[in-house]
């Protein structure tokens, strides 16, 4: 995938060519991103494997008190800095922490720790940059951060034929990277709120202008196939 700027440049994803509107200075980083995406399979043998076990010191399977202690250690957060809520659809409990900065993303970030409906233990962590209320967010800074993270994840080997890079999944949303480990874990790196051009079968189409500022999101998932969320048993209705 390529991300570019004032003059949209060609963005070549793992499956579909895409173009982005964003500053020219992102071009070199994006070219590197594309090459990494295309060569990931060929280079995987010489790369260390990535095991999706959580985020920083927060490990999947930890209880809420354990994760709260880890948050305090990782970010110097106080109990009052952490909010707790229940997802009414999935039945999961979510601990949320806002941090003033988190490299490589620009500006503040939000880290959400999700606990399973049945197990009450950590099953997913989401890290997000970009505030929907901040219309002045710099798209180039968000794209640059996404490029750095894509290159980071692409530097590891993943389960065969599971990696994807530069895949449009919505009018203004692109999966910069996704990969699955040898067990049940998965990572998703998503860029939202960007305008791009996509080339398919020799024809180009342009996405609509984004309705909000750019956002960058990482999902660390413990069980990609069978998440611990509230479900209605088969045959109940």
What do the PLM-derived regions correspond to, one by one?
Residues 1-23:
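N-terminal secretory signal peptides that target proteins for export/translocation
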Residues 33-42:
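C-terminal segment of classical bacterial N-terminal signal peptides
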Residues 23-32:
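Sec-dependent N-terminal signal peptides
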Residues 85-136:
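Mid-chain, structured segments of secreted extracytoplasmic proteins
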Residues 45-83, 89-90, 124-237:
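Non-cytosolic coordination micro-motifs
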